[in-house]
């Protein structure tokens, strides 16, 4: 998928328009960011295949306690779009932080999809979990994370009520204790009111379930507009950057630890996640 019209609109509105895009440097950064879609997807696919093979090996030849399995669902923010490296995505940072606090091997499957909406989670990612034996089969995860809604905010044909209905069905299907995030602030964009409405619905659905809320929205609303725009966004002014994902990872780590009634690991202190992918080196970009 090429650079969308919304990326240019978001960038223009956030930064005052064409001045940021007058030079080839800014355009080049946007083009490099767009190429992340394929590179990051392939890195995660390669990693997921290796992780599934590891699970199968442990099934056949157990090595003590089974691994702590994390499954991440959602959109391009879960893929790590905007980070300088796929290992700086929040799922990778979270997995590394959890590893530091456990005496078990930690495995991560990232089934997210760039461009995903709530419909994508219900109609593609949940069935994928089921097909891989992650819902009713032998590889039931210890933790599921879900970040979704940013693309739904931009989709005018997605009614907030319909979004909530689908989310409630998803939460009912997931294992207990899932970590579900609200939608980050849209700043001065006209879709901000929809983002607030949908985030309120996420909060209500989570409160009615056995999942736990990760309030990305409150975090992003704390920043001044210039700080949020320029310090915590990638070149398209839509996706988070590495610095933002570090903050996200800590919020997820805090929620995870709180659900277990134990101190939270410090995500920033955790080493780079050792992905089981031969394609990680292909995922290096400037923030």
What name fits each language-model region?
Residues 80-81, 110-120, 149-161, 185-191:
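Surface-exposed cleft-lining segments at the edges of enzyme active sites
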Residues 120-162:
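Oxyanion-hole/transition-state-stabilizing segment in secreted/luminal serine hydrolases
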Residues 107-109, 177, 210-212:
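Conserved beta-strand segments of alpha/beta enzyme cores
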Residues 1-71, 137-139, 257-287:
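N-terminal secretory targeting modules
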Residues 188-287:
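Catalytic His-Asp segment of secreted/periplasmic serine-dependent ester chemistry enzymes
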Residues 71-72, 108-112, 143-147, 179-182:
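Structural recognition of the beta-strand scaffold that forms the well-ordered cores
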Residues 36-112:
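Serine-esterase "nucleophile elbow" of acetyl-processing enzymes
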Residues 147-151, 170-199, 218-220:
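Active-site segments of SGNH/GDSL-like serine hydrolases
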């Amino acid at each position: 998928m090429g650079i969308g019209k919304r990326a240019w609109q978001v960038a223009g509105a956030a930064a005052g328009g064409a001045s940021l895009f007058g030079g080839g440097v800014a355009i080049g950064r946007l083009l490099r960011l767009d190429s992340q879609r394929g590179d990051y997807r392939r890195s995660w696919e390669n990693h997921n295949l290796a992780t599934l093979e590891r699970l199968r090996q442990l099934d056949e030849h157990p090595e003590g306690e089974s691994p702590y399995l994390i499954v991440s669902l959602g959109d391009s923010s879960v893929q790590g779009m905007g980070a300088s490296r796929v290992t700086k995505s929040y799922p990778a940072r979270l997995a590394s932080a959890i590893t530091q606090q456990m005496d078990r091997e930690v495995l991560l499957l990232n089934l997210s999809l760039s461009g995903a909406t709530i419909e994508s989670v219900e109609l593609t990612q949940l069935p994928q979990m089921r097909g891989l034996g992650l819902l009713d089969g032998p590889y039931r995860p210890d933790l599921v994370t879900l970040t979704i809604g940013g693309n739904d905010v931009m989709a005018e044909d997605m009614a907030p009520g319909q979004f909530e209905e689908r989310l409630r069905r998803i939460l009912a299907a997931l294992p207990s204790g899932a970590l579900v995030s609200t939608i980050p602030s849209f700043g001065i964009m006209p879709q901000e009111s929809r983002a607030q409405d949908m985030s309120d619905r996420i909060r209500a659905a989570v409160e009615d379930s056995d999942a736990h809320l990760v309030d990305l929205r409150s975090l992003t609303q704390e920043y001044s507009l210039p700080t949020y725009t320029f310090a915590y966004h990638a070149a398209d002014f839509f996706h988070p950057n590495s610095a933002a994902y570090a903050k996200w990872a800590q919020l997820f780590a805090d929620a995870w630890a709180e659900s277990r009634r134990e101190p939270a690991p410090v995500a920033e202190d955790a080493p780079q996640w050792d992905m089981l992918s031969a394609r990680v080196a292909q995922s290096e970009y400037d923030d």
